[in-house]
Amino acid sequence: MSSQKGNVTRSRPQKHQNTFTFKNDKFDKSVQTKKINAKLHDGVCQRCKEVLEWRVKYSKYKPLSKPKKCVKCLQKTVKDSYHIMCRPCACELEVCAKCGKKEEIVIPFNKEPDAPENTENEGSGHRRRCGRKEDSDEDLDAESDSDGEDGDTQA
């Protein structure tokens, strides 16, 4: 077989096929792994987002221990792993915080999506609480009605 790379098509299927997908939290159920899995990759382009998700999926993602230096403002403000720019600089220049290219940002840095979710949750909780209060009022009414009936039968 020749040693040429890239210009050759495979004539046979892969010899060994995995039966189960890799789970990065199967044996490592640490707090750090949970944080990494829950992290939202915002302020990056589609390609960089896919790269970061791949790193998380296959346990290759390493969080920063201390902030890195931003390439634009030269301050130690980069708190996300594999990023080269801090959030304010990336927002201001409208570029990807990881590769620095002027690509379309998939999930922007803004905090607006978090606010509506919280208000929706608070609203639904309010509805639940109101429903509980109404239920408890009905229970009290039912108890007072039953007391009234008991009072009628005794008198």
UniProtKB/Swiss-Prot annotation:
This is Uncharacterized protein C9orf85 homolog. Residues 1-22, 110-155 are annotated as: Disordered. Residues 136-155 have a biased composition (Acidic residues). It comes from Mus musculus (Mouse). InterPro entries: DUF2039. The lineage of its organism: Eukaryota, Metazoa, Chordata, Craniata, Vertebrata. Pfam families: DUF2039 (PF10217). The modification N-acetylserine is found at S2. The modification Phosphoserine is found at S136, S144, S146. Keywords: Acetylation, Phosphoprotein.
